[in-house]
Every structure is written in C-alpha cells, then in structure tokens.
Amino acid sequence: MSSALQVVCLSSLSLIGVVQCQNASSNANHSSSIQDLPSYMQYINATRNDPSPVTLNIDLNDKSARNSTASDLYGLMHEDISHSGDGGIYAELLANRAFQGSNYNSTAIPGFNGSLIGISENPVEATAPVLTAWAPIGEDVRMTLDRLHPVSKALPTAMEIDFPLDADGEVGFQNFGWWGMDVSPQEYQVSFYVLGNYPRNQANLTNFHVSLRSNLTGEVYATSTISDVAVPYIDYLKLSTTLHPNMTAPSSNNTFVVSFDGDQVKGQTYYFGMFSLMPETFMDTRNDLRKDIAEAFYDMKPSFLRFPGGNNLEGLSPQQRWKWWETLGPLVDRPGRVGDWGYYNTQGLGLMEYLQWTEDMDIERMLAVYAGFSLDVYGQSGASYPEDQMHVILQEALDELEFCMGNTSTYWGARRAALGHPEPFPIKYVEIGNEDWFSSTYSYRWPYLYNGLKEAYPDIQYISSAYDENEYYNISIPAGEVWDTHHYEEPSYFIRNFDFYDHWQERTNNSGVEVSLGEYSAIQIDTPSGIVNYSFPADLHIFYPRLVSALAEGVYLLGMERNPNVCKFASFAPSLQDLNWYNWTPDMIAFDADPSHTVLSASYWQQWLFAHYRGHETLPVTNTEGDFNPLFWVATIDNEKNAVYVKVINTLNTSVPLTVNMPQKYQSINGTILTGADLNSYNYIYNQTEVVPKPINFTNAPVTYSSSSNGTFQWDVPRYSLNVLEFGL
C-alpha cells in the first residue's frame, strides 16, 4: 500500500481525553436495506446473470489426480499502521509512555514538490516529544518535558513535575491511555522510573499512590501505595506494583493516576520516565499481546505471521528504518523510531515479541528483512543503498537470522539466550523488502541479498517483493522461491481473476516459482472504469469489509486453493484498525480501548471459514452441467476426519440449483453459511453479528435439499452467500 496516501484521523493528534474521530460507524446508515441502495450497489459487475443449475461430479477414486493443499495458505500480516501495534495488539495501556516522539502528517503543499510534513503535533520540531495523553492533578502543579535528566541513552526525554510550595491535598498526574483504557477484574503490572531534583529534594520519604479511575466520575477502581520511597537524585529508581480491580468499569473512559499527599511533596521536583501499565496478556506469556485481539487472530487458525511490515519496515528514511536490534531488551533501552504511518513507534512490540507471538500461536514466521530501500514523506520515491554499500544491509539480515536461529555459541544466539530464549526460533520464510516495485533499484538489491542469504541459509524459502510490476524491469525469481503480490481492488477484479493462477507458472515462464498474496482486500465498490481511486471518495470507498468483500475475496482465494502448486500464502491487510485513528480502511478487525467494541469483519469470517476447512488434498471436480460464475467452488478431502469439504460461493442475487455427485454414499452432511441482508451488509460496534458464519439447517431451510444413497446431494445455493459443505464419508 502507498504510504503517501495516508488517511490520518487528524482529530486524534490530541490524545488527551477520549476523542473518537468521525468514521464509518458514526455517519453510516446501518439500517439501510437493499431496496434503499442505488442499483449499482445491488450487484457485482463481473457476475453473470445466469442462475442455471450446476452439477458437480467429485472423483474420490483417482488418488493420482489429487494435489496436496497449501498447508500454510491462510495467515496473518502485521505492521504498525492505524495504531495496530502501539495502542492495538501491543497490550500497553499508557499512551506516550516514554516521551519518545509525536504525531505528524505528510501532505501535498502548494508551491512545493511532492509531499511535506504539513501538520505535526509538535509545531516546532516534527515528531519531537510532547506531553500528549498526560495531565497534572492539583492546583498549580507544573508539568514539562526535561532533557537534562535522561532516563537512559535510548530515552533522553523525561517528564518534570514541579509541586508548588503551598501544595495541599491530592497532587500528581494522570494518563488517559489510548483514547481510554479497559478496567476489569485482572492483574495490572505497573512500573515507572523516578528521579529527584537535588536542590529541591528534602530527603524525606515519599508515598506514591497508583490508581485506576473513571475519567467521568473520579471513582477509584483499584489503588496501590508504594510507601516510604527515598527518591534518589543521581540514578533513576524503578518502582513497580500491581493493581487488582474487583469490578469492570462501565466504560473505557478511565485514567491511570500517580498521586501524592501535597504536604509531603510541596516544593519538590521529580522527573519521571518509561511508564508501563500492562494488563494480563494472551496466554500470559512475554508476547505482550492484548488478549481479545490476539485471541481473534488465534481463532482464525492462521498458519503464518508476516512481520514487521509492510511500509513500516522500510522507514521514512534509511536512518528511521526498522532496526531490529534496537527493539531488543529492556524497554528503557529501546529508543523507538518515527513510524511510517504518522506516529512514533515505541518498539515495545519488537523482534522478540513477534517471535514469541508466533511461538505461542504455533505458526510459521515470515520474517521481512530490510532490503536497502526506504520511503520518504515526499512519496514512494525514497532512498536506496548504493550497490557498493549493500554489504551493510546483507550483514544486518544475516545477524537478524543468527539472532533468531543461531546456537548459543554465536554472538546473536547468545544475545537471544540472554533475553530468556536459548532455544532457536526456526525461520522457514524470509521476504526481502516490501513492495519494491516502487523502487528503481530492486534489480540489483534483490540478487545481492538473495544470493548472500541463500548461501548462508540455503533451506529458507525466499520471497521477492517485486516481479513484473515495475515498467522498467522484471525480477528473475529462481525456482523454489516466491513472488509476493498485493491487490487492493474492486470486488469484480477478484471475480474476473478467479482463474489467474491457472497455469500461471507455464504462462509466465516461472517454472517452480510460487506466489504469496501478501496483502489484499476489496477497497472500493465496483465502478464502470474498474480503476481504484486512492483518494478514497466516500461514495465509493469501503470503510468496513462488507458481504461483497467477503464474497469477492473468497472467490479469488478459491482460485488460489485450486492451484496449491503455485499459491503458497494469503493474508488480508491491513489486519487491524483503531477506530480512533486510522490511516487505511478497510481492515480485518476494528477495535478501540473497550474489548467489547472489537469488531470481526465479514472478511475476517471469510478467512476464518476457509482456514477452518482446509482439507489435506484437492479433489478433481468435473462440472457436467453449468460453469463457473455465478457459482464458484473447490473440493478438498480431510484425511483425518474422512470428510469432503465443498466450498461454494454464489455471487448472484438469486439462488442457484446445485447438484453434487460422489461415487459413494456419504454418512452425514453439515454446512456453514456466511451471508447477510444485502451485498453491503457489514459488522460494526453496535451490530457485530450482521455477517457471521451460521450453521445451515438443510432439513428446515427455505431451500430445496435432498440426498440419496448413491452420494447425490441437491441444494439451492442461497443468493449472495459463501458456504462450506462438509460430507462425512
């Protein structure tokens, strides 16, 4: 996706309080029916208006005609976009916890070439630290930023709190979180660093009161006191405690408070840095993943995770690229970086956290390594490492792989062990760069990095981030490796290209090369031109994945399932979106600070269904009546369950008769359907189940159903539906 096309919610440049920006949930007519929609939104352009019957003969006898399915086809892609990392799946509840940097927005400015930083949270120095999300408590309590007392080399900015000489009652400060924070019965881990000012330090012992409170009523949900602290003035002291609320707050509009007795701290100055408020995390491990979001991912049964990007891998300059080694170790030693998507990245979600994520979910790692090309606020035409300096980038990638997989006798393997994981993290897949068709230099960067990495790690499968997209050159991808292609399209594109991967290797002279659909989504409704408008006009743009998205994307993925010798991976992107700040829509999962607001989209449920019913081998299917479009199908067999899965999608606005013939009697038939009131149905905060999988009751359904002893099944496939039929043999 293009980083120059940011759709940043500018109202969220101010994080203080809970300010939800205008988005699809706030101004869409959620109750509209298909009768209210314009005619062009009631059908898919590429669908043939032909409800003629379809008859499929599934061959169970000729095992030589089967192909093994792509076992890793369905997976996840994650980069920190739309606050999907900080404020998202990274469970940290405090915004701007270490005063590392601030938000910005690149935009075109009349009279200048390309884009520039047009709006920045810090008006003097773009991306520089700010006090956003923090506020003082108590009359005349002064809060400023301080660079004279750095917490660490990585974190040079602290927060200075000056208490007036007449301080009385409760004084202190609070953090409003990422547009609020969830408070519920669980254990919260709290830590922060504090330092005193020597001339003002009165050498008394201080009580630190830590609490979670309602930002609306002031009600205290949990509190803890760290008593009799002798605050030092040379080296920072790290304080830690836990909080245990015994109730669920009625909303997420809550705050984290550090407070004092004014009489105890009057006239003093303290410096604070590197705060953390961490709830219980997914599987209670060191992955630091927010439970509800991680559980939604886990429930999809993904096979891989592509990380850490995406554009966010590349940086807005080579200096601001994702430097994996800076994401390791204690949080106080992680400097963070200017992210590609308009906000500073804390890098709390670092390389070790990503690796732990994959280990906890038992999925393969698709590690994307920096390939010597960075973006720029100007646009996509960023800087590339010259060929005579590519050895630096190759060594970075080799070191990263040594960190992941090296034994403990190696430098980086020992570093991994010192961080608590002596066992290696096996890496099967490495992607070299991201969307390098935007660059004019991948023609030398790809072979340089590929050859160097292949020599050192010959068993890894390498993924090229470009092939034929750049009009000036094609990339030669060796047999056994993978091409990563990205598609943000109209629904009809996916349907018209259902057969794109049929004979793809032969047609393109790419013998032995496989394909990864690394990013995809239906991004706008069908238009006469079929051209995606990346300015995202509201009347065309799809903000939340709709039923039409799930159907069209599903058809394209059926085309991939039919070609497992070519199609290796598929991952929807972007995967996550904070409803208060988004750079890009649609996204697979939308969320805010309240876990009950996490929305699993129609596209999520499409991939959930396909991943749950994969099968081990594809089955040969002959259509003796009818053809593809408006019905699309694929059949696989699950050898462990001794079951046949038939995935059938109907993209027409009326039912289509289907007959399935098998050479033997089936013992049972079960089905699951994904559909909705109309093509534009979608899930949102206040109706999260508009488009969700539901079991098919064949005997009581308002469609014709019959089965016979010879393995014949007849059913009218409902209009606008994605279905999985399970035949128990």
Model region roles, listed by residue range:
Residues 80-81, 90, 99-102, 313, ...:
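Aromatic/acidic polysaccharide-binding cleft in carbohydrate-active enzymes
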Residues 630-665, 671-676, 721-724:
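Carbohydrate-binding surface patches
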Residues 279, 308-311, 376, 408-440, ...:
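Active-site groove signature of glycoside hydrolases
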Residues 1-24:
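Fungal secretory targeting signals
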Residues 254-269, 416, 436-557, 563-566, ...:
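Noncatalytic carbohydrate-binding groove/subsite architecture in carbohydrate-active enzymes
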Residues 22-311, 315-346, 364, 382-391, ...:
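Extracellular and organelle-lumenal recognition/adhesion modules and their flexible linkers in secreted
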